[in-house]
Swiss-Prot record:
The keyword RNA-binding applies. It comes from Limosilactobacillus reuteri (strain DSM 20016) (Lactobacillus reuteri). This is Large ribosomal subunit protein uL2. Pfam families: Ribosomal_L2 (PF00181), Ribosomal_L2_C (PF03947). Residues 254-281 have a biased composition (Basic residues). NCBIfam families: rplB_bact (TIGR01171).
Amino acid sequence: MGIRKYKATTNGRRNMNGYDFAEITKTTPEKSLLAPLKHTAGRNSYGHITVRHRGGGTKRQYRIIDFKRIKDDVPATVKAIEYDPNRTANIALLVYADGTKSYIIAPKGLKVGMTVQSGPDADIKVGNALPLKNIPVGTVIHNIELKPGKGGQLARSAGASAQLLGKEEKYVLVRLSSGEVRMVLATCRATIGTVGNDEHALIIKGKAGRTRYAGQRPHVRGSVMNPNDHPHGGGEGKQPVGLPSPLSPWGKKTVGKKTRSHKARSNKFIVRGRKRGPHTR
């Protein structure tokens, strides 16, 4: 989608921009593919906060997305491109030859009226889903499975993609957008192309209210809290941390401290780690 700039009629609108929704062809979602979406404000079943800075936001309904793409050898026609408030990418409404409807993440270049298909014998074209072993080396892909049949988990956000680098027996090598190269089972599926709506990275919210609409609450610095609320808190006026290392609200080392387990089973599938900043090397 293109970017629409607003006039500076107020201070909040001075640098604000938004989508022009030029690619959106249908404004009302398909009722049969909706599900209720309960907002928990970051609380668990006991009412304890498990994720901070969550709460509020506009009411939404969940769009049921087909991440598995296991309806093989049945062509589907793209009937509409829709906006999904629950993700950064747009979604495409598919109608299969047998009348079944489903949503998929809309890849870049997918238009209304185009035909897509899934299965081992599907063509290598945008929107088709195949097992990784059937995709040529060098192809750009998205919505990549990590376990066969579980559904795509990697490269699903707006503008995201990965590249198939090579094949080794029952595994293939995939380079992710972070620069990480990892082995994935060749029987896992992926979709051809790049996720659409890559202009999402250019969006400027302009005011705090747009962040609140998304259900995000203010992120307060520890240095401006009291000592009983955060290890960085307290002191007269602005004070340094006063510790050998910055700490989380619960006293754990943070900012550069590696948190990934050395015993994680998936470590053996990472051929080359992702690119990191100088403070984490």
